[in-house]
UniProtKB/Swiss-Prot annotation:
Pfam families: Gemini_BL1. This is Movement protein BC1. Phosphorylated. Transports viral genome to neighboring plant cells directly through plasmosdesmata, without any budding. The movement protein allows efficient cell to cell propagation, by bypassing the host cell wall barrier. Begomovirus genome is shuttled out of nucleus by Nuclear shuttle protein (NSP) and the movement protein transports the DNA-NSP complex to cell plasmodesmata and facilitates further movement across the cell wall. Belongs to the begomovirus movement protein BC1 family. InterPro entries: Gemini_BL. The keyword Metal-binding does not apply.
Length: 295
């Protein structure tokens, strides 16, 4: 999703963490954020409320020499997702650039679960030693509660640069896109005999589903099959048996079988075989007759 530089909102009712020093690391390292107290979370839970992050600010203040090089990558992860899909937003900026990072959440979370958001950083392509206390991070959180979740208008991440020698051309940031959705039809025994006879409202019959009825359309098997085959060329392979899907032996297996079934000989071995065979023929068929003795 597109992100752009924008004015950050003013701080109001923010929960602030301490401005702590962090060691330089090439691996993802967690930045500790201060969340609402256990008592506040318990009160919200009693009210059966859910919670979201209205606004998150990450302040970065570097403390490295002026000839230090490298890039800092900051990531926000949502631990409700699988590890390979948990990344929500990320920023990349120069190691010597003092900057504020702004993030706006687009979802609620239940207080019955642990707070899912985690903040990490790492440094790449740098000439500064690892484990050097290279910068200070400070987090500010503004959270809100609601009786139930609602759709939240998307707000792109933003940055505010405090170092004059850097500009928006030196930083980059991104946000995850909306997840894709493809409707799955419900299978039933009546699907094979369903058909629409004319334009008019779709009426569900026993054993039908709205998805299956609304995607069948007018009976035109050629048009439907061409469109479906173009969109999903392998959609019905699961109906074939395993023997039909078996491609047979691989090239390596076929080559191995040929190698095992073929006798290979060198030129010297072949010459020796011919010489031995000829010699055996001469010995067996060309011996002179034995002279008869006179009695």
């Amino acid at each position: 999703m597109n992100s752009q530089l924008a004015n950050a909102p003013n701080a109001f009712n923010y929960i602030e963490s301490h401005r702590d020093e962090y060691q330089l690391s090439h691996d993802l390292t967690e930045i500790l954020l201060q969340f609402p107290s256990t008592a506040a979370q318990f009160t919200a839970r009693l009210n059966r409320s859910c919670m979201k992050i209205d606004h998150c600010v990450i302040e970065y203040r570097q403390q490295v020499p002026i000839n230090a090089t490298g890039s800092v990558i900051v990531e926000i992860h949502d631990k409700r997702m699988t590890d390979d899909e948990s990344l929500q937003a990320s920023w990349t900026f120069p190691l010597r650039c003092n900057i504020d990072l702004h993030y706006f959440s687009s979802s609620f979370f239940s207080l019955k679960d642990p707070i899912p958001w985690k903040l990490y950083y790492r440094v790449s392509d740098t000439n500064v030693h690892q484990r050097t206390h290279f910068a200070k991070f400070k987090g500010k959180l503004k959270l809100s509660t609601a009786k139930h979740s609602v759709d939240i208008p998307f707000r792109a991440p933003t940055v505010k640069i405090h170092s004059k020698q850097f500009s928006h051309r030196d930083v980059d940031f991104s946000h995850v896109d909306y997840g894709r959705w493809e409707r799955k039809t419900l299978r039933s025994k009546s699907l094979s005999r369903i058909g629409l006879t004319g334009p008019g409202p779709i009426e569900l019959q026993p054993g039908d589903s709205w998805a299956s009825r609304s995607t069948i359309g007018f009976p035109n098997p050629h048009t439907e099959s061409e469109v479906e085959n173009a969109l999903h060329p392998y959609r019905e392979l699961n109906l074939l048996g395993t023997s039909a899907l078996d491609p047979g032996d691989s090239a390596s297996q076929a080559g191995l079988q040929r190698a095992q079934s073929t006798i290979t000989m060198s030129v010297a071995q072949l010459s020796e075989l011919v010489r031995t065979t000829v010699q055996e023929c001469i010995n067996n068929n060309c011996n002179p007759p034995q002279p008869k003795s006179l009695q």
